[in-house]
């Protein structure tokens, strides 16, 4: 029984029972808490005997503490109980659990300091399993078989659930790589998981090698080599080397590094086995908060995140994803609330009852004059203050004062306070000269006059002092603030001690440091940290300094500084603040994907001319502020290269951002497509603008810039490469388009709202501006727009400013009253590559939007299959003909017109053949707005009507996108054909208004199916069957006139055989035929009336259908005893299907009438499909009244039973439930006495292995008779587990289930005791479900058998220690040994030879029994074996 009541005795027990569970609570610790703690320790494979001593308790606390952050409430309760018990053992006086935890924390902090001090003094490692021998040398002590067994058990039990990771962490603490490999080998049977783990370890090892290159030259004597990735993984290093690294000076913790790699891999495995994200865990409307917390923490343990991130998730997501009722309570508790407080506050929340209580509480507070807070009711009424005017007593939304512009928090315009990201706009804000909102008096024009990314230093003096860079303001309340731009270094002329010098205003420097200046007075020496190291300076106090007319006195340092610096000690005294005014373009915050780091791709070699070109380009970009030089502290890199521009000698810099793109967060494409010219309205005046260096005008998020680092190498590695990072959006980075489009839209918004009569089409850096103004006025507005863009840093170059038609825009050519695509030249080639054909198809597709009749189907066929871009393609005759037709179409230029909103749209569609269609959209005949083509084939079996609907839907979608409305359609199909198709077609689709146009070729239906059976025609029942393994099948039919036929098929499937059967029926029937099938697949194909198909058999069926005068096709469900269908099914199933017919329906119904078993049991016992079994249950008048009880499985040990008494018909029924399986033993007892209960328990113990019984506190269960039986049968009795929500839940649930079954069979029995036993039989053997789909009877047997096998396995593990192994090393042919056998697997054994643990293949090991002690060395081994 382990540590139970023997843990405490005498005075210690008295002290234990005086300690309260909670501060100020009534409940105190009792003996049952010790019993519960010892049971819980057994679950965690910890020895309950440790509870008997203070040292044991300390060991338990050390094991449990690492798992507290991610553990359940039960784990925390166990930790608290053991902490209190430790205090009792140590005779530390504590009053409650909280006080005990504080004492433990103090003790742990002291121990930690002591350990750190000792380690610092001695330099020795305290890590297990590295221990010191008698000579003080570190030696390796292998992991014990007990530890390995615990690890195997946790993997087998938990199956890579989140609990595996903390368990691995705890078991592998301080282990060497060799120990860790041993742990992985013993669970090597999980091949998929181990492969994932291996891949992760290989990746991390490769990354280690990359970051830690091998130093050139020989290793100095006495110095160890540096470990490689494979050494850390233990594959190319010995235990002695690993110990050397771990205990060296400085140490290299190879064990911890390898552990970290394994935990990374385990996280991936856990993620695969537990795919639910923490973001998906949300509390249901009526879900108890405790259940939600359990689900939340279970998922949290599977998340691949650091502990800090997990803590953040707990603090924010737990509250954020709670339901509204709980969320309001949790927010009222405040951010510092503990989980225990949350769970207490949210008890009973949810459902109508809670709503009623909240409503009643709200109604009761209507009469009260003061508002009371949920916490701190005696703090008085809450004082509210207006953000707008600053007065108390009202909120900003009710303020009558004029609303102040900009944000109420930071004073900036462009956003509201709720969107404000400013935390502290100014450093040292207490020294700000202006109060409240006075800083907002600056006009936006003045702030924007600077460069796009400017930051400014403002002097907040109260006096109107003149300064060159200042901005003067008139008015009584205004101040003059000198302004220094930070676009360049803020160098100003200052007067110090009467001398004028130029100095840098540096808000990042603490002190004012000057060079080459003679100051009066005494000085004292001082050393300060400067750029590049420490510098010696002279310190002068009380020196007068004047900056921009502002005077102050302070300390000045004089010494060899690279530049004169005015530091914060002076700047703060004159009221100088660092301001970040609204950046003309706000940076969009960007992050990497979770758990990813920036790119670390090496720069590849470049030619001399490319290096020179890149150096020149980068120098220019650096001057413009687009990139900045960086130092070696940035570990990231992306390759850069250069190409020559088209038709030019100039070079173009390209950066290969593929790796960064993979790692960058995803963006939403702001613009979903490109604007089309057909949607443009005709305008009197038009201008096309292009934004120069578009991306380079938008700043990149400062925190993200480091990831864009790149290196310009030198020739022959003459010097280290020059490193840069981007300050603006880079070309080729995935985020640039979205961020640019978003920024551009915000910038154009004010101009659009001021000029609603001007149309601006924006796509990336191309702008189309149209208006109905006269040309002079229009051009004035254009200049206004250009100035507006320039104020935000966007330049519109003159060379790309198109004032006169034709305008080239987005690949189109725009004229005042018409448009076309820019001229297209199709190349003439003798040989075509795959790349050439791809470009050709792209050009033709682009031309097809205005040139009607373009086809590309035959050209696209040439590209089928996986081909390289440079492969030569031979044009087929069809492709050459198609290309020649396209050339003819493109010879004559075609123009489209502009859209007139006052006229209707019309769309006309023509069939071109070979599944190709063309269409034109116009408002006036022969003046097309747009044309297009359609050649997509959506399904294998189709007809022209179906394809026509697909074209109509494509044109409708296109029209909605371009014009916002749907055109009227003119289609080449007659109304009768259309209606015949759509009346019967099962997959109805919406079609807009249309009219018939007689444009050959017309669309028609080639055959039609009848709606009703054909009188007098022969009826064919068809069916097919195929065997999945052999691919053999049969198809056949049976007719109502006695005819039948079966044909054998090879390499077929069930679906093909069904179609073959229909073909047989059509082949052997007359001109009129009725066909009945049980295949929904075949029915769906034929009812759609296809006229062509990719399937040969479907094409043959179509040919036969066209030949027939009338065909009726019908469907019946299979296996329902329908005459002809059943006959043909038996005919084709012979020798093909394994299970033929449901002969068991009658037997199942008869069985259900007797036992009322559930559908799972019938499906299993009588081989019925679930739908049939459920139908039997649904048709039973006794089973359909209530829903079937749901059974879960509680994770408990095999020997635990719950007992309870229930009452029915005035009699007592004693019920015992095996918790793990749900198996029931029940009996009607004469009276609810201890004697009867004891007799029942004795009978139960005689039938099943009973270790623990869990009962309530009824007098019969607490009687002396029951205690005596439990003592005799060695049964432990429990009356309740602290903090366990299960309590008596299992047996209470079974009581209800048992009564329900008794109600169903009560009529069949005369006496209640008979009905009870019948109900027990039904529950145990006639109801299936839960894990494995077992009945309760099958499950209990399975659980007990598994338990016996597990114990036997453990015995075998202990037995193998009695064997010794002689083995041969791969490099040495001499046999070694004897070694101790630790583990025997299928292909290898784990052995211990002296202090080394090795894995040896079975073929190189000889295992023999140890028949006696050896003469030397075995005493040590035996001692260690006993310890294990």
Swiss-Prot record:
Site residues, Cis/trans isomerization of proline peptide bond: 217-218
Residues with lipid group (N-myristoyl glycine): 2
Interaction with host CALM1: annotated segments: 8-43
Extent of Polar residues compositional bias: 114-130, 444-456
Annotated spans, RT 'primer grip': 807-815
Region (Interaction with Gp41): 7-31
Domain Reverse transcriptase: 624-814
Residue numbers binding Zn(2+): 1152, 1156, 1180, 1183
DNA-binding positions: 1363-1410
Region (Interaction with membrane phosphatidylinositol 4,5-bisphosphate): 73-77
Biological processes per GO annotation: DNA integration; DNA recombination; establishment of integrated proviral latency; proteolysis; symbiont entry into host cell; symbiont-mediated activation of host apoptosis; symbiont-mediated suppression of host gene expression; viral genome integration into host DNA
All copies of domain RNase H type-1, residue ranges: 1014-1137
Record-given protein name: Gag-Pol polyprotein
Natural source organism: Human immunodeficiency virus type 1 group M subtype A (isolate U455) (HIV-1)
Upper lineage: Viruses, Riboviria, Pararnavirae, Artverviricota, Revtraviricetes
